[in-house]
Amino acid sequence: MEEFDYYEILEIERSASGEEIKKAYRKMAMKYHPDRNEGSSEAEEMFKRVNEAYQVLSDEGKRQLYDRYGKQGLESQGYSGFSGRGFEDVFDDLGSIFDSVFGGGFSSSSRKRSGPKYNLDLAMELDLSFKEAIFGCKKEIKIRYKDACPDCKGTGAKEGKIETCPDCGGRGQVFIRQGFMTFAQTCPKCGGSGERIKEKCPKCNGKGHENKEENLEVSIPEGVDTDNRIRVSRKGHVGKNGERGDLYLVVRVEEDEHFMRHGNDIYLHVPLFFSTVPLGTTLKIPSLRGELELKIPPNTKDKEQFVFKNEGVKDVHSAKKGNLIAQVKIVYPAKINDEQRELLEKLSRSFGVEGTPHEKGFEGVFEKIKGWFS
């Protein structure tokens, strides 16, 4: 089998933090997920590798072994990765991994040994515009989900005939003795199910399910943000007993060219020409719900902020709203003509000593420095 590096598979640095590993796993698992790459053997293989890499690198003990000794170090301790295991076994492992990545929101019922060969909960990304996320919307989506094969009743075996796994005796675990220590690991033959398929179901080729599609209209609440999860009850995969999991929509929000969001607060850069600074002014600025009047006092500093209470994003869990923060950005001309130069020089002279603050500020400093070297 072709060797591969776990860090390269997840496209991360070897110094990556646990959070970075989790984020990279989620990205790569979504990229190569079987629901997105139907019939692609290359994506199937990459999906296995991504999960193998995550199982090792997300475990501090396994990661230290791998960093120091490579895969040989893992194998010497009884960790066999996905060697000799089928694709459905890999997919079944996603239950525990999804729990760690998405915060434990996925049902554990779908991972019982008597359940189907796949997690009943379904996750997919949902792209939203800035406006859709701020104000909420109705969204038409198409989902692809698994339904238990009617011929084998979701077992994957011809006529539903299942045998006890001879390697683990139905326990789902095998034991490896190393010196005085005995380690238990998931049976590589049955993937922990304790069962074996002697002859595959011809209709589903042993998968235990068939793929289906469904169009849905989902309600997006006001105030959702990137990485928020929206749960749609009973719209996930369907198990062999008719039980259906939940659909989890992982939100991705497009950035806006003018407004910048941070939590429920909105930031807006307000360009202010330099000649206006000593005078002050009143401006009309855009807000999420229309326009606001911003009074800028004389001698406002660059990056100074003005806060408009309750003009931000409505909190997704309550009626409370964030703030709009208008931040001044002083703008200078890229170039000036002769007439403008003359006017500026005349203006500077009109301030007298005040127009040359550096002269008074450095008074006596030059003589002091000369004294250091005399």
Curated annotation (Swiss-Prot):
Q: Could you tell me what the cofactor note in this record states?
A: Binds 2 Zn(2+) ions per monomer.
> Record-annotated residues binding Zn(2+) 2?
C165, C168, C187, C190
Q: Which residues form the J domain?
A: 5-70
List the CR-type ZnF regions, as residue ranges. 136-213
A Pfam family it matches = DnaJ_C
List the cofactors: Zn(2+)
Record InterPro entries: DnaJ, DnaJ_C, DnaJ_domain, DnaJ_domain_CS, HSP40/DnaJ_pept-bd, HSP_DnaJ_Cys-rich_dom, HSP_DnaJ_Cys-rich_dom_sf, J_dom_sf
Keyword list (alphabetical) reads: Chaperone, Cytoplasm, DNA replication, Metal-binding, Repeat, Stress response, Zinc, Zinc-finger
Mark the CXXCXGXG motif repeats by their residue spans. 149-156, 165-172, 187-194, 201-208
- Where do the annotations place Zn(2+) 1 binding? C149, C152, C201, C204
Gene Ontology biological-process annotations = chaperone cofactor-dependent protein refolding; DNA replication; protein refolding; response to heat
GO terms, molecular function = ATP binding; heat shock protein binding; unfolded protein binding; zinc ion binding
Work out whether the entry's keyword set contains Signal.
no
Q: Where in the cell is it found?
A: Cytoplasm
State how it assembles: Homodimer.
Q: What is known of its domains?
A: The J domain is necessary and sufficient to stimulate DnaK ATPase activity. Zinc center 1 plays an important role in the autonomous, DnaK-independent chaperone activity of DnaJ. Zinc center 2 is essential for interaction with DnaK and for DnaJ activity.
The family note in this entry says: Belongs to the DnaJ family.
- NCBIfam families with a match to the protein in the record: DnaJ_bact, PRK10767.1
Q: What does this protein do?
A: Participates actively in the response to hyperosmotic and heat shock by preventing the aggregation of stress-denatured proteins and by disaggregating proteins, also in an autonomous, DnaK-independent fashion. Unfolded proteins bind initially to DnaJ; upon interaction with the DnaJ-bound protein, DnaK hydrolyzes its bound ATP, resulting in the formation of a stable complex. GrpE releases ADP from DnaK; ATP binding to DnaK triggers the release of the substrate protein, thus completing the reaction cycle.
Name of this protein = Chaperone protein DnaJ
Protein's gene? dnaJ
